[in-house]
Amino acid sequence: MGCALHPKTLRPKVTNMKIIPIVPMTKKQAATVCGSLTSTSKMPCKSYSLPTEACITGFKMAQIPGSICSLCYADRNFYKMYENNIKPAQFARLDSINDEYWVSGMVSHIGNDQYFRWHDSGDLQSLAHLEKIAAVCAATPATKHWLPTREYGIIKDYIAKHGKDSIPENLIVRLSAMYPDKPVNVPVSLQGVPGVTVSNVHTAQAMGNACKAPAQNGECKDCRLCWSDAVVSYALH
């Protein structure tokens, strides 16, 4: 396959970001490179999942009783019921992140979809991983991307390396809460950074805009707040 830049690539706002050429490929080729995408019943779009066992901060938090990660939905319910099918696919995706054509594969998968969610299971693995996701976002300007994460340190490293205006305009990075009813404490270096917002988890009173899904049969329906810079609060589930 010959290399060619996407004609409508949305560049990050800084000049020190490495430009990754996008190699055109079919959906079948994309699946071979980076695995398949996932579909969840409540979401209005495709999503991408990794194994929770690979979570860095999440794995540590899961050992703390009462933390959100200790109650992780991705280790229960639908995911647990079908783990014999889901887990191998998730680990295959994890292995594929280092593939030189991973960015191209994800760009092909996403295409011109209006919305996309990163990590309905799992989380960021490294600064290089986040840089690749940013490259995917830059190469899919028609798509609004939502990236929830507890890897605050990786986000801080990204901003320190590339600058406060380096998050692609079509990407929302949502710092996720560690505990129910305790709002996210945004690191000083990430305060006021365009594209960075938070999500909290509540048992009673919402801390921000309450997610509407519980009142809508667990579905987003026409709500797209998670793809905005608004603070969102999810009911503990």
Language model features with spans:
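Class I S-adenosyl-L-methionine
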Residues: 3, 10-237
